[in-house]
Structure formats: structure tokens, C-alpha cells
Amino acid sequence: MTCPKFSVALLHWEFIYVITAFDLAYPITPWKFKLSCMPPNTTYDFLLPAGISKNTSTLNGHDEAVVETELNSSGTYLSNLSSKTTFHCCFWSEEDKNCSVHADNIAGKAFVSAVNSLVFQQTGANWNIQCWMKEDLKLFICYMESLFKNPFKNYDLKVHLLYVLLEVLEGSPLLPQKGSFQSVQCNCSARECCECHVPVSAAKLNYTLLMYLKITSGGAVFHSPLMSVQPINVVKPDPPLGLHMEITDTGNLKISWSSPTLVPFQLQYQVKYSENSTTNMREADEIVSDTSLLVDSVLPGSSYEVQVRGKRLDGPGIWSDWSTPFTFTTQDVIYFPPKILTSVGSNISFHCIYKNENKIVSSKKIVWWMNLAEKIPQSQYDVVGDHVSKVTFPNMNATKPRGKFTYDAVYCCNEHECHHRYAELYVIDVNINISCETDGYLTKMTCRWSTNAIQSLVGSTLQLRYHRSSLYCSDVPSVHPISEPKDCQLQRDGFYECIFQPIFLLSGYTMWIRINHPLGSLDSPPTCVIPDSVVKPLPPSSVKAEITAKIGLLKISWEKPVFPENNLQFQIRYGLSGKEVQWKIYEVYDTKLKSTSLPVPDLCAVYAVQVRCKRLDGLGYWSNWSTPAYTVVTDVKVPIRGPEFWRIINEDATKKERNITLLWKPLMKNDSLCSVRSYVVKHHTSRHGTWSEDVGNHTKLTFLWTEQAHSVTVLAVNSIGASSANFNLTFSWPMSKVNIVQSLSAYPLNSSCVGLSWLLSPSDYNLMYFILEWKILNEDHEIKWLRIPSSVKKYYIHDHFIPIEKYQFSLYPIFMEGVGKPKIINSFTQDGEKHRNDAGLYVIVPIIISSSILLLGTLLMSHQRMKKLFWEDVPNPKNCSWAQGLNFQKPETFEHLFIKHTESVTFGPLLLEPETISEDISVDTSWKNKDEMVPPTTVSLLLTTPDLEKSSICISDQRSSAHFSEAESMEITREDENRRQPSIKYATLLSSPKSGETEQEQELVSSLVSRCFSSSNSLPKESFSNSSWEIETQAFFILSDQHPNMTSPHLSFSEGLDELMKFEGNFPKEHNDERSVYYLGVTSIKKRESDVFLTDESRVRCPFPAHCLFADIKILQESCSHLVENNFNLGTSGQKTFVSYMPQFQTCSTQTQKIMENKMYDLTV
């Protein structure tokens, strides 16, 4: 263990007992001091410790200070010593080089001073001593360390500190009583270092502590001079805590710390720091009274090391130990402040110093960015210095959280280069609404506020603070510098609730919410509340509700609450009692009223009523609704009318009596107002006069009808009286024979409704109303009846009717004079039976109509779709009607249809039945005069070449039609004269080898050609100037453009048809190569201009160019015996290659197919 530097130097001699006399106490200083004891200028023959001189010394003219020393007889190292030895002792302070000597001279008590410090080195012994009070002010400590190293053997060393605490009084000396000193043993180590602890109570810190040291070693005892001190003057505080450094808003380095908490006085601090940067190195030592120090000229990339210690400011004290060193290094980019917490609408600024490659960037080259996405305009920049740039954000909006980031990042950049460090900007909306209300007893005020509208920050706390003014509120509330916090409890609904109790009704309570965060504090806008202005009164008491008798109004009464004493307004809500009350509101502004009456539609219902109140001037809140009050249903008026009634007549033929049973329905509450105690039947006859009969609550009465006329009236009676308006019924023998109902018809509409209609004949009697009566026949069912006004001629009965049952309907006319003769029917009318049987038509007919419309629409759409598939989607064989029923999954189908056809195919009907194959053969001439050589417009296509001489088919002028539904191997195209839009059917090309031709076939073709072109309207042979008709030609096809204004003369096949038909099924077999199928599309010209075609090899859709329309057709015959060797001159310069329309069978070679496939085809006429 290393001894502290504050200690007491002890002088040890074995077997020596030294007694130092003293008269005065040395005052202990707050700093370290040294106690030195020196022998007198007498030389002794004993061995002194090393470093102590034997030379004598003077006391600079003063008398010697004599210290007596008693020696034991057992001493072995001393010689020629008297029994007493005198020593000089000196107290030497760090603050003073002179020594104060304590001596016991003849003149009395005195201090000997001005002793040179060399005396301590020549002879005597030295002690370092320092004493102080701990910071907890409970323990006084002294450290002692010997500076003289004893060369002798060190015996058991014991050190005691003797002390006494004395209260200091002015003018009185310190006189401790004998035996008043207390002793504490000090803890000593092997290196002669001791520590002594003296307990001191807090109440005696200002007392004087007298003490001296008692040192025992090897049988010798040494008493040090007396010392004195006040503990409060030597307090040593603990080192400062929480050392921290940061860059301030102005760019300075702020060193801050916190002072010890137990010190009873203010401290001063000593700060030492060093700065190390690439451009500067410096050290400083400053003393401040605050707990912070600002260091200016801070540069990026610098390192600072700081230590702090403290001591009493306004009195003596001891410096504390130095705090632990704290190191702080600035970044290459310095933001000050690095983080800002502010509220919405405020203006804030950031400063920046940018260091790039050991060089500080000029502030004029710095640019600012927000979140690295938005460049801040230069109008918001300010140049603070050569290297400090400033940016200002005015009127800030609340920060929108982006994931876990609850702030905006502000970047300071060197033109186009940005460092990864950034400043953080937190903007919070602190508009928190605080609402308060005072209870009805005026004893407490409850305030509520919610934080749902603001953004919560991690580490932030919320606190309500308030300031109470003596009277009322200021015009503009503001945050007062002196405020008090208020504890608020979080409720289940998310609101915080604070209670002020007791309260001052007229004082102004200014409140705001403070948001505390490590970055700073924010205050919400303050609001000022006067408890008297936010009173919520108690609800009115003694609320009653009733329906007033004879008047029929809802009367409500209440009592005003005791508090507050202001004038109050009242609000009443009332409604029919039930699960969900439909409230109606009524307000009362007359403060003197305590009751009111309101009209209600139903006087016989139970009403619920509640009342609440509020200050008449509008301040404060509405009170809670009072406890509901309910009305009691009682009779408020006499019944409005008596019940409607009817009768049943029972005749007893044996007794010749008629019994009448009156039937009536109980009155409803709205008619009885509000109950019926009994029913009274009033009778009147000419013989017996008038009498009444009380039947109680029964709803029928039977009496004997004995006179010609008997009138009855049924009255309803409640607690107030009998009904005033009643129904009368007179039973008269003569009137029962009056018949004015001519007919009655009943029509069942459904199982719950039957319609009745009737016809009346003129009558002189005054008809009042009808009674309609119905029941099920053949059963003793209850009779049902209704009263119908006299003006009605048709009426609908709503009841449950069984269709299989028969009903009896009776219609009674009721006159003033009595009941007339009824019209009775025992079943529905005949029309009614029909209507009943056909009742299902009302449901079935709409369904059938809807289904028909849907089916018709489906058929129309299907027809259009089929037409599109069969006509416009060619060449897909699956969309063609001729392919229906064929299995294209079998290879034999394709082989049979498209590969080998050695036999001729019988001509069949068109694929679409609604369209005509050919009605006639017409030839239109396209020339204007006989001299013009214009080719014909429409000519038949002969599929074979029969003999022209054996048959003739002539073209005449007749307009008749020749139908070829069963014609074989021939297709005739026709254009209807009445249709302006040309139409093409289909054509087939078949060729056979020349060797296979029969002579008859050749003759038939020659005859056809010669006869058909020999008529008056036929084409002259000269029109084919460049064409030659050869017998060996197997097929030809003439087609040309037709002018839209020219008409086509009709060609009629009236002759030679039989000859042509003879060849049906007898065509020779073909032996040429495999032939391909060609397709020809048919559409209008306008549509063809924008249409496309599909090639056979490439399978690519290609548009039809406009210049290919109305082009000539050229039939290429290479291996097909050359039907046409030269092109037909058809009146246009263009040429067109023909491809057949339908997939009939043609025998052109594959090479011809390829040539034709590369052409544009059109066959519109």
C-alpha cells in the first residue's frame, strides 16, 4: 500500500520518551502542511537519524524554545544526556516558506518564525499532514506520512488521535477540560503511513476541533503540538460527474459536467484540456464557476481530452481529485446542432463545417439537401463565416414517419459530393386540445387531453403544466416561466385525466402540455380556463310526466339544481317508451318555468321524458340527462265513438221468434281514450220506448225481436263517461224487403285477396253504408263482416281464402230506416272460376315472354355467328356446312375428299339453304354501241366439253328462270337486276386429259357455245378477238367488271337441258396428278378493301390492295389442256388469277396452284 502524500512525520527513537510542551494550538490550513521537530543548538553524543545535522542553530535573536524530553534508563544509544531534552518544532505550509515555531520560553507563549528550511534537513524529523472533511459531511480524515526514514529498528508503532469539539464563542479562549479529549486509533501501514477518522455530526460542522497526535514506539511516547480546525472549512468534494462534450449551435465545443449533489455550498471548477488537430495543438487550464466551459475555434477532425476538479467557491476548502479523463473527437463534417426537435410552424436553422481531404471547404461551395432527394433552394442559405454555412427552414410541417425513421435527414454537401453524416430534424405537431369541466358541486375541475393527434418519439414524456393567476385569464394565454406539474392518469379511452381539487372558481388556470425529450422540450399552445365558466350542472331533479285529463297534453315538471346559481336553460326530450326511443327535443329558455305541456299524437301510450340544463349565457356544458320519467296510461277523455257492430238473426220456426245477436269489435285505445270499462246497448222501440243494457266487457248481446222496428245503439263507457258518437242500427220488417243490389260478383285474385263488385238500382231511401259478410259454406264457421262506405262500388277483401272451399258472400244495404235485403252469392262468379283457373298465367306468361325474347336474341346472334363462320372465315373447312358429319380425325376422309377423284362428283345444293344457287343465266353487255368490242359481264363456266353438235342450249330474251338444283358439274353465276350489290356464288374447275374426252362431250360443248351466243342478245363472236374456241379446251371462265348503271339481259336455258343432264354420273375418270383445293371468299367491295386473305403455304394474313379490285381473271392451264391460251380481254388493263370459291374438285397442277397462291384474288362483280 502506497501512503498518500498527506501525512504526519513522526520521529522515532528507541527507548526515548519525548514530551513536547505547548501552550497554543496550530490552526490547520485547507492545504497540506509539514510538522518539523528540531533539536536545540546543543550537540549530543547519540546517533541521530540520517539527514539531521548536529550543528547548532540560532533562533534569529529570539529566546530558545525549550522542549523537555524524558529518557528511560534502558536506553543504550544515548550518552551524557540529561533527564530532559529540548526540541524546537515548526509548522511549515505549502503556501509559506517561513516556519512557525512553537516554544515554551520564559517570557511566556510565543510563535518563533523566520526559521530557515535548511534546519529541517540538518537535524530533527519531518511529517506531512493533511486533514479534510468528506463530502458527506460525516467524517473528518487526517493522513500522515513520515518524510524522515528511521535507520533504527522499527518497533510496534501505534498512533492515536486525541480530539475534542468545542463551540467557539467570541472573546472566550479555548480551554478544554481535563479528561475531555477523546481518542481514536489510526490505521498505520508498514511504511509509516497512517489514516485517522474522526466522526463529526452535521450540527457541529462549525465547531472548533482541537487535536494532537500521540505516537508510541518501543516504549517511547511522543505528543505532537496541539492543532485546531473547523470542519466546515476543510471540506473536500468528490470529483465532478457526467463529463460531456458537444458542438453548440454556434460551432463552439461545450464542455459540461454535473456537480456533486451533497455539497452544501457552491463550487468553483478547474478545467484542463488539450486539443490535437492536423493544424493546431494547444493546452489550457481555466477556472470557472459554472458547470460548463465553451471552447472556441473548433475544427473538424480534432481530438480533445478534458479533466475537471472542484472546490468551495466562497470560502476555504480543498480541491477534489481530478475526474476521469474524457476524450472527444470531432467528425469531418460538423453539424451544429446535430439534432433539432421543434414544433409545427416554427423556423429552425442548421450550421455546417465541411472538411474534405484535410482541407476545410469554403462555405460558399456548400449546398444542402433534404433526405438526399430534395435540394434546398439557395435562397435559404446564409454564409456565417469563411467555413460555416447556415440553412434555414421556415414554417416547418410535421415530419412524416418513413418506416422506422421518424425524422428528416439534412445533408451538408461539398457541391456535388455528400458525406454520409447528416443532421436529424424532428418536427412534431404539438396542437393538443385540453378540455376541462367543473362538477355540479363546484368542488373540483377535471381536465382531459389526448395524444392521438401527435407523433410519439422514443424517449419522450408528456406532462401537463399549469399556472394559476389570481383572477380571470389574460387576453392572450402564454407559457408562464413559473409553472407547476400536474399528475395525469391514462384512461381506457386513450385520454389523460387530471383533477384539480380544491379550485378557485374565478382564477385563471393557464395550461399546456410539455413534451420532454433528450433533444429538448416542446410546449403545446397554452389554453386558459376559468372553473366558473366550464361548469357542468347537476341534472334537474324531481322530473315528472303525465297526460292531463280532459285536456290531453303531456305535462312535464322538474326542479332546478342547487348549483350553479346562474340562470339556466332547460332541454326536454320525450318519446314513446320502448327499446329504441325516437326522441323529440323541446327547449325552455324561461328560467322561472318549472313545468311545461306538450301536445302528443297518442294520448294512450307510455312516454319517456328526460330533462337537462345549462347556463343561459351559453358558458359551460349541458348537464347529464335526468333519470327518465314515464307517463301512466289513464282515461283522459270520453271515448271518441262507440264500436261498430253487426247482427246475426236466428229464427225459430216452431216458436215463431227471431233472436238477434249483436256483434262488435273491442275499441282501440285511440278511440276509447284510453280504456273501456263496459259497453252499454241502448234499445228503442215504439211500444216499449228506450232502455239500456250494460253488458260489461262482452262483445255480443242477444235479444228478442218482436216489434216492427227495433233500433239499437252500442256505447263505450270509460272512467270519464260514455262515448258521444255512436253507430245506430234499425231492424225493420218492411225495410228487410227493400232490394237495391242488382248484382254481386266475387273474383279471387289470390289466396289472400278477393275482389267484389256490385251494381245498385235507384232507391228513394237514404243509404248510409254497406255491410259485407262472408263465410265458408256448409260449415259452422265464424261470420266475418266489414262496414263499407255507400259510395264504393268495388272492394277488396284481405283474408286467408282456401281455394278448394266455397264461400258465401252477402252484401247488406244499410238505410236510415233499417237494414235492406241482402244480395247473396254462394260461389265465385263464372268469370271468377276462369280467373281462378288461369291465375297461374300471371306468373307463367311473363316467364314465357322473357324466355322467348332471350331465345330470339340467341338465335339472331347465332345466325350472325354462323354466317360469319361459313362465309367470312373460309378457308377453314370445319366452319363449312359441307363438312358437317365428316370425321376429320380419319386420314381416309382427307384422302377421299382432296387427293384422288377419278369419278365426277354430282352437283349438289348450296351450302346455305336460304340462299339461291342460280335462278337464271344473265349476260350484261358493257358496251355502249355495236362498234365497241366489250367483253361480256357474266358467262357460265362449263366444267366439261361435251359434243356441241348433239345438243344445244340457247340463250333467249325470255325473263324466265332455269333452276339447276340437280345440275351436274356446272355452276352458273347470276346477278340479280334488282340488287345493286353484286353477289357471287361458287364455281368449280375440273380438267381431264385430252385423251379421255368422248366425242359426245365435245359435241355438247360446241352446241352450247354456238347456240347460246347466237341469240339477239348474245355476245358477238367478234368480241373475243384474241380468243380461240377450241374443242380440246376443257374449261373456260369469262368474268369482267360490270358498270353499276348497266343492266344484264337474262339468259334462259330453255333447250338442250336434257342432253346435258344425260351425262350425270358418266364423266370419265381422271388420271392426272393430285389436285389441290382452292377457296374463294365472297364479300362486298367496301369490305374487301380493308379485308385480308390467308395464303396456303405461308399461312400469313395479308391485306387485299385496292388496286387489285375489278381486275381481269386469267385461268392458267399448264397441264390441264389449256382452256385459255390467251388472256380474255375483259375491258381492263389489269389481270387476275382465278381460284375457285368452294372446295369442289379441280385438277389444276401443283405449279398452277403455287402461281395462283402468290396473286391477289378478287371475284366481286
Swiss-Prot record:
Regions that span the bilayer: 839-861
Stretches for region Leptin-binding: 467-484
Residues in the Extracellular compartment per record: 22-838
Disulfides per UniProt: C37-C90, C89-C99, C131-C142, C186-C196, C188-C193, C352-C412, C413-C418, C436-C447, C473-C528, C488-C498
Compartments where located: Cell membrane; Basolateral cell membrane
Ranges where the Fibronectin type-III domain occurs: 239-332, 539-634, 642-736, 740-834
Processing and modification events after translation: On ligand binding, phosphorylated on two conserved C-terminal tyrosine residues by JAK2. Tyr-986 is required for complete binding and activation of PTPN11, ERK/FOS activation,for interaction with SOCS3 and SOCS3 mediated inhibition of leptin signaling. Phosphorylation on Tyr-1141 is required for STAT3 binding/activation. Phosphorylation of Tyr-1079 has a more accessory role.
Region span, Required for JAK2 activation: 892-897
Spans annotated as Required for STAT3 phosphorylation: 897-905
Expression tissues: Kidney, liver, spleen, lung, brain, testis, uterus, ovary, corpus luteum, theca and granulosa cells.
Keyword Membrane listed: yes
Cytoplasmic side: 862-1165
Annotated positions of the Phosphotyrosine modification: Y986, Y1079, Y1141
PROSITE patterns: FN3, HEMATOPO_REC_L_F2
Motif interval(s): WSXWS motif: 622-626
Glycan attachment points: 41, 55, 72, 80, 98, 187, 206, 276, 347, 397, 433, 624, 659, 670, 697, 728, 750
One GO term of the biological process aspect: energy homeostasis
Modification type Phosphoserine: residues: S881
UniProt short sequence motif Box 1 motif, positions renumbered to this chain: 870-878
Domain observations: The cytoplasmic domain may be essential for intracellular signal transduction by activation of JAK tyrosine kinase and STATs.
Subunit details: Present as a mixture of monomers and dimers. The phosphorylated receptor binds a number of SH2 domain-containing proteins such as JAK2, STAT3, PTPN11, and SOCS3. Interaction with SOCS3 inhibits JAK/STAT signaling and MAPK cascade.
Assigned protein family: Belongs to the type I cytokine receptor family. Type 2 subfamily.
Function: Receptor for hormone LEP/leptin. On ligand binding, mediates LEP central and peripheral effects through the activation of different signaling pathways such as JAK2/STAT3 and MAPK cascade/FOS. In the hypothalamus, LEP acts as an appetite-regulating factor that induces a decrease in food intake and an increase in energy consumption by inducing anorexinogenic factors and suppressing orexigenic neuropeptides, also regulates bone mass and secretion of hypothalamo-pituitary-adrenal hormones.
Protein's recorded name: Leptin receptor
Species of provenance: Sus scrofa
